[in-house]
Design a protein with these regions (language model features):
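Interdomain "pre-motor" coupling segment immediately N-terminal to P-loop NTPase/helicase cores
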Residues: 1-34
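Long, charged, glycine-rich C-terminal linkers/tails
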Residues: 163-173
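Conserved RecA-like ASCE ATPase "motif II neighborhood" in helicase/translocase motors
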Residues: 171-184
Length: 190
């Protein structure tokens, strides 16, 4: 039998985002270089923490690895929002906005979405396509209509590309591959 001891498998109590990447300043993340080196058609892995051995722990939502579906659950104060912020930032550091973008659905009154936008300056994470909060019911309904419209738009673009390239099927991974090869003109992000 395997015997675990607390000393061998102790997780760090706190690691901030920059520390996780081994840098001291945002500029040292070299996001533009990381964007150029990434290949979202092969992997969507991004660091989300440090494991018990002090190594980066990565999550990959590519369909060929951990998969694109997940659930985050926990008690109040357990770190759900911190995890989401870390994961969104980590994907943004590693993938160009043409490759990965986010619509945040925030039912905490906009507090989570506020982590990605400075209300004073208007500067926001370039990957942030929009936010939906529970504060305005009319806005929430408009946002859901917009999401449905975007799904129809993507289906149309995929169908056009499928016909133009004589492909049987096209999914987001194949489409992005064609985009990076210059075979289609419009970027579509995950």
């Amino acid at each position: 039998p395997i015997k675990f001891t607390e000393d061998n498998y102790a997780l760090p109590t706190l690691v901030d985002f920059l520390e996780m990447y081994g840098v001291g300043k945002v500029e040292q993340l070299n996001a533009i270089f990381r964007w150029q080196m990434s290949n979202p058609t092969a992997t969507l892995q991004a660091p989300i923490g440090i494991d018990s051995h002090g190594m980066l722990f990565k999550l990959d939502i590519h369909e060929k690895t951990h998969g694109p579906h997940g659930l985050i659950a926990g008690m109040t104060g357990s770190g759900k929002s911190e995890f989401i912020i870390t994961y969104v930032l980590s994907l943004a550091v590693n993938y160009h906005p043409n490759d990965v973008s986010f619509i945040l659905i925030d039912y905490k009154g906009g507090g989570l979405a506020g982590a990605f936008k400075n209300e004073d300056t208007g500067v926001k994470l370039p990957h942030l396509a929009g936010t939906i909060t529970n504060l305005d019911t009319l806005e929430m309904n408009r946002s859901l209509v917009s999401i449905q419209s975007e799904l129809r738009r993507r289906q149309s673009i995929f169908n056009e590309a499928r016909q133009a390239l004589n492909e049987g099927t096209i999914d987001i991974y194949k489409y992005q591959k064609f985009y990076h090869e210059g075979l289609v003109k419009e970027p579509i992000s995950h």
